[in-house]
């Protein structure tokens, strides 16, 4: 049975039993670090780096939109009991920005994107002096976010520095391999079909990394509204460029995407839904798609197949249930 170390009334015996499970590791000086992470992508990264030296609680699960999420009472309780909280930054968790800034004055709170070089970021069209926050869509950039996690876990648990650094190195190597797979797979899409149209503009870094034209019905934030002019403009693009497929997202309504399909059909061009992509949230916990690696593998494989590439539905490691 999983021991919930975030509960203040967790029996001491249960905590000791959990620690005993680390027998194959160096002797731990304390109980595992209690970590809170806002998004699933960050929670997955911290679990991969921290291993059994951390217990991670993610605030936003599968299908949850971070652009509109607000902290709950249970979130605040978890953060109160945590040793450290990691959030994304770059205005991703916009409704929580003020709360997190205030929390930072009384607890350990760190934005994993803080150390990224602005030169590699995409300017945010909706806000002045801001950037597109969806950096996890580019494996090379996302791997750089491990540095803050390693530094802060090590500050709290210096005895486990080697574990954290080795796990982070493994994470980076996996990210590099995923980037290579993505590049090779997406090159199989015919050049004229390299157009990715989704519910909102979350795939800018994907497009920049893999030479795709990326179009979102809504802006970078799902809080922006799509007007009739935008829908009409995108319908014309679908028809003119004979785009075969568009994509829905797990954390965004498909209403606008279906309006596009209907608009294109009215002009005599059939467009299908190429599949469901993970944009701002990963898949269900406990599944391959419920990890960052699985999330990106699924997206790349789904996009490639829907746009004409002859690639396996099982993905990079053969772990996908089948792109859909």
Segments predicted by a language model, with ranges:
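N-terminal secretory signal peptides
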Residues: 1-10, 14-27
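Extracytoplasmic metal-acquisition and chelation regions
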Residues: 3-7, 30-324
């Amino acid at each position: 049975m999983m021991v919930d170390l975030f509960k203040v009334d967790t029996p001491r015996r249960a905590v000791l039993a959990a620690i005993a499970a680390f027998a194959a590791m160096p002797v731990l000086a304390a109980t595992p670090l209690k970590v809170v992470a806002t998004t699933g992508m960050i929670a997955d990264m911290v679990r991969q780096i921290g291993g059994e030296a951390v217990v991670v609680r993610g605030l936003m699960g599968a299908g949850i939109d971070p652009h509109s999420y607000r902290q709950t009472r249970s979130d605040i309780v978890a953060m109160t009991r945590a040793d450290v909280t990691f959030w994304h930054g770059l205005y991703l968790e916009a409704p929580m920005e003020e709360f997190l800034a205030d929390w930072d004055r009384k607890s350990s709170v760190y934005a994993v994107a803080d150390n990224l070089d602005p030169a590699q970021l995409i300017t945010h069209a909706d806000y002045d002096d801001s950037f597109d926050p969806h950096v996890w869509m580019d494996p090379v950039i996302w791997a750089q976010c491990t540095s803050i996690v390693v530094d802060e876990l090590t500050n709290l648990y210096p005895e486990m520095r080697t574990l954290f650094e080795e796990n982070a190195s493994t994470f980076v190597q996996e990210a590099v391999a995923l980037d290579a797979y993505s590049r090779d797979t997406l090159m199989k899409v015919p050049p004229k079909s390299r157009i990715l149209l989704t519910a909102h503009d979350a795939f800018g870094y994907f497009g920049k990394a893999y030479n795709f034209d990326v179009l979102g019905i809504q802006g970078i934030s799902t809080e922006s509204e799509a007007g009739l002019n935008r829908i009409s403009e995108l319908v014309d693009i679908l028809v003119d460029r004979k785009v075969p497929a568009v994509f829905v997202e797990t954390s965004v309504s498909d209403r606008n995407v279906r309006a596009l399909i209907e608009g294109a059909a009215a002009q005599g061009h059939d467009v299908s839904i190429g599949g469901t992509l993970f944009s701002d949230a990963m898949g269900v916990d406990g599944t391959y798609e419920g990890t960052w690696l699985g999330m990106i593998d699924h997206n790349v494989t789904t996009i490639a197949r829907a746009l004409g590439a002859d690639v396996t539905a099982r993905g990079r490691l053969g772990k996908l249930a089948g792109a859909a």
